[in-house]
Every structure is written in structure tokens, then in C-alpha cells.
From Swiss-Prot:
This is Serine hydroxymethyltransferase. It comes from the Bacteria. It comes from Rickettsia rickettsii (strain Sheila Smith). Belongs to the SHMT family. It is found in: Cytoplasm. Its main location: cytoplasm. The modification N6-(pyridoxal phosphate)lysine is found at residue 230. Keywords: Amino-acid biosynthesis, Cytoplasm, One-carbon metabolism, Pyridoxal phosphate, Transferase. Coiled coil: none annotated. Pfam families: SHMT (PF00464). The keyword Nuclease does not apply. Catalyzes the reversible interconversion of serine and glycine with tetrahydrofolate (THF) serving as the one-carbon carrier. This reaction serves as the major source of one-carbon groups required for the biosynthesis of purines, thymidylate, methionine, and other important biomolecules. Also exhibits THF-independent aldolase activity toward beta-hydroxyamino acids, producing glycine and aldehydes, via a retro-aldol mechanism.
């Protein structure tokens, strides 16, 4: 076998078929998973480039390997572009994921056993914010704050009370399932009162922050972490930002050699391409459309009688509370999947069901907005979702309705282009 002459379909027919089938799946469903998006062909091309061959431990101009001249240029471009995008002084584009970006901040600023204060999982927080099964919950004394039991909004008074009581070394703002804006300035006030560090995890809302559609944490947080996919529409990966260059030096050392070895230079190049796309005027229009579409989706579900957590959304996330409907999140997500609508089961604040079952579903608009969906299309999507949920309330067998909605999905999705 001559590896330099064979294409994928010649070398590995099984993987080639899997990719073909996945392309068909992605092209034919309404994608409502809030953490997913579609990258541009340019980003795909960059992350499939031969930069994957290059080892580049260290940082630009300070590598442990020779032959890094070109990958240095790529990483410097990514750094400068993302600093411009977020108007900050420091950026590290090497984290392999958002989780590893968070871990690097912990390694830079904390010692094992230090107290961290983050949002609980059922309130919309992330595993890496102190959840018991995660490294952040095992290595540190993790304390969680919740949302208000009546409004389901972040309770800043409760956060301040917990901070005064537990004196955390690090306060974390950020979420994986919270549909409203965050007051980063208020978090900083609390941090300053107790002498803690402040980390903002903007993995979900990075695109909103970059375009000015959400308050930026850069002036307030000691460190800001994010993924580079989701609303940034780049390759899967992470990044760390700050205006404190001294903390930036600590984070650099924590990430390499503390946490990671060689960076993924093909992914960093793809990040640079995505950041260039994010700097274009049309990207702001895209983010505005993402938000408008989410509001339209939420309103259409409310019109059909479904409870939307917090009564609506300020971002790209719509959380549907199914408790009064007698439907589990798992049942709803699986039925929607069979109908060609992909989402995920999701815990609702103070959820008493198993995290593998849940009492709600999480819906998001970034992916379908990338394909060109507008408000009127998401109104239709909302009614499709409601039709499936209505069927689950009234019938044990939802298969006929699932097929009917699948036919509607197929007609709608064919109107919007996908990769050639």
C-alpha cells in the first residue's frame, strides 16, 4: 500500500462509508443541538491540511522542535485575530477543548483543595465547573450556586452569600444550559469582596460576546475560556483570553508543559480561519439572526402551551420544561430524533429525575441559522416539535406522527443548502 497515492475510499472503505452516511444525516435533519454548528468549507479544508504532520511543542518562536516557521505564522495569526475579535491583550489558542481550557486556568490559579464556586449542573452549569464526577469536583472543594426557585434566573444575592460563607479561591460564571444574559460586572463585584479570582466560561455565548450582542467579560474576569465551535462556528477546540498578561504567562505555563504536549497545528490553523470569518460584518448579522430565531422558536412553543424556562431567551438556547406534560426529556428527544429533529434531553433546575432521563429538552438555533433559517422557519420548527410532544402526551405509539413530521422536515430542509 502506497499511502501517498491512495485516497480514503481506496484505503478504508468502512470509514469512508461512515463519513458519507454522516454527511447524509447532517444534511437531512433539523439540527437543534445548541452546542453544534456547521463550519465553512474553508475551516474544513484547513483542519484537514498537512499541518497535522507537524509537532510544535511550546509557543511561537519558543518551540522544542525545528521546522516550525510556518506553523508559527499560523498560530500567531490565530492569536492576533482572536485578540482583535474580543478586544483583549492575551490569548492562548492551544487548548484542545473547552474543558482543557478550564483545566489550564485551574492549574494556573489554584492548588488542590482550594474552594471553587460554580453553577450547579441542574441549574445549567457545566461538568467542569465543580461537578462531582469531574476532575474539578475531585481535586477542589467545589461549592455550587443555583438559580432562583421561582424565576429560574441567576440569583446574585445567593452567589454573594455563598461567596461570603465559603471564601472561594475561584468564582466561575458560565453555563451549558441557561437562556438569559449574565451580568459579569456583578460577578466581579462579588469576587472583589472576597478576594477571589474570576473565570468566565463563555463557550456557548462567545459569538454573542464577540459581536457585542452580550456583555463582554473581558473587562471583568481574570480569565475567560471558550470553545471555538458552537456560536464561533470554528473547529472543535478551546481558547483562553485575558486582559491580565501576568495571569496569561501563568496560563501559558499551565497549559504547556503543565497540561498538554504538542498542540494540534491543523486545528489552530482552522481556528485562525474561523476567527477571520468572525471578524467580517456578516458574522454580526448571523449572530443577530441566531438570537431572533431562538426567540421565534420559544414563542411558537409557548403558543402551543409548552413551558419555556424563564419565559423566553436572550441567546441561542431554548429550554423546554416538560414536567407538567408528563413527558421525560429522554422520551421527547428520542421521538424528535426519529422525526428528523435532533436535540438533547436536559435537566431542569431542581430536577428530581435521573440525569440520564431528565425533565426537559434543550433546543438551539446556531446550526440551522448557518443553513439559512429565518424566524418564519423556526416558527414552523416550533410547531413540528410541539406536534411530536402533543403526540407523546396522547399516545404510547408515536410512530405515525413521527413519520408525518419527518416528511415535513424533509420538505423544509431541502430548501436550505448543505456542503456540495
Amino acid at each position: 500500500m502506497n499511502i501517498f497515492n491512495n485516497n480514503l475510499h481506496e484505503t478504508d472503505k468502512e470509514i469512508n462509508e461512515i463519513i458519507k452516511h454522516e454527511k447524509l444525516r447532517q444534511s437531512s435533519v433539523i439540527e437543534l443541538i445548541a452546542s453544534e454548528n456547521f463550519v465553512s468549507p474553508a475551516v474544513l479544508e484547513a483542519q484537514g491540511a498537512l499541518l497535522t504532520n507537524k509537532y510544535a511543542e511550546g509557543y511561537p518562536s519558543k518551540r522544542f522542535y525545528n521546522g516550525c516557521e510556518e506553523v508559527d505564522k499560523a498560530e500567531n495569526l490565530a492569536i492576533e485575530r482572536v485578540k482583535k475579535l474580543f478586544n483583549c491583550k492575551y490569548a492562548n489558542v492551544q487548548p484542545h477543548s473547552g474543558s482543557q481550557a478550564n483545566q489550564a486556568v485551574y492549574l494556573a490559579l489554584l492548588q488542590p483543595g482550594d474552594t471553587v464556586l460554580g453553577m450547579s449542573l441542574d441549574s445549567g452549569g457545566h461538568l467542569t465547573h465543580g461537578a462531582a464526577p469531574n476532575m474539578s469536583g475531585k481535586w477542589f472543594n467545589a461549592v455550587s450556586y443555583s438559580v432562583n426557585k421561582e424565576t429560574y434566573l441567576i440569583d446574585y444575592d445567593e452567589i454573594e452569600r455563598l461567596a461570603d460563607l465559603h471564601k472561594p479561591k475561584l468564582l466561575i460564571a458560565g453555563f451549558s444550559a441557561y437562556p438569559r444574559n449574565i451580568d459579569f460586572a456583578k460577578f466581579r463585584e462579588i469576587v472583589d469582596k472576597v478576594g477571589a479570582y474570576f473565570m468566565a466560561d463563555i463557550a456557548h455565548i462567545a459569538g454573542l460576546v464577540a459581536t457585542g450582542e452580550h456583555q463582554s467579560p473581558i473587562p471583568y474576569a481574570h480569565a475567560v475560556t471558550s470553545t471555538t465551535h458552537k456560536t464561533l462556528r470554528g473547529p472543535r477546540g478551546g481558547l483562553i483570553l485575558s486582559n491580565d498578561e501576568e495571569i496569561g504567562h501563568k496560563i501559558n505555563s499551565a497549559l504547556f508543559p503543565g497540561l498538554q504536549g504538542g498542540p494540534l497545528m491543523h486545528i489552530i490553523a482552522a481556528k485562525a480561519v474561523a476567527f477571520l470569518e468572525n471578524l467580517q460584518p456578516e458574522y454580526k448579522s448571523y449572530i443577530q439572526q441566531v438570537i431572533s430565531n431562538a426567540k421565534a422558536l420559544a414563542s411558537s412553543l409557548q403558543e402551543r402551551g409548552y413551558d419555556i424556562l424563564t419565559g423566553g431567551t436572550d441567546n441561542h438556547i431554548v429550554l423546554v420544561d416538560l414536567r407538567k406534560d408528563g413527558i421525560t426529556g429522554k422520551l421527547a428527544a428520542n421521538s424528535l430524533d426519529r422525526a428528523g429533529i435532533t436535540c438533547n434531553k436536559n435537566a431542569i433546575p431542581f430536577d428530581e429525575t435521573s440525569p440520564f432521563i431528565t425533565s426537559g429538552i434543550r433546543l438551539g438555533t446556531p446550526a440551522c441559522t448557518t443553513r439559512g433559517f429565518k424566524e418564519k422557519d423556526f416558527v414552523l420548527v416550533g410547531h413540528m416539535v410541539a406536534d411530536i410532544l402533543d403526540g407523546l402526551k396522547n399516545n404510547e405509539d408515536n410512530s405515525a406522527l413521527e413519520q408525518q413530521v419527518l416528511n415535513e422536515v424533509t420538505k423544509l430542509i431541502e430548501l436550505f443548502p448543505f456542503y456540495g
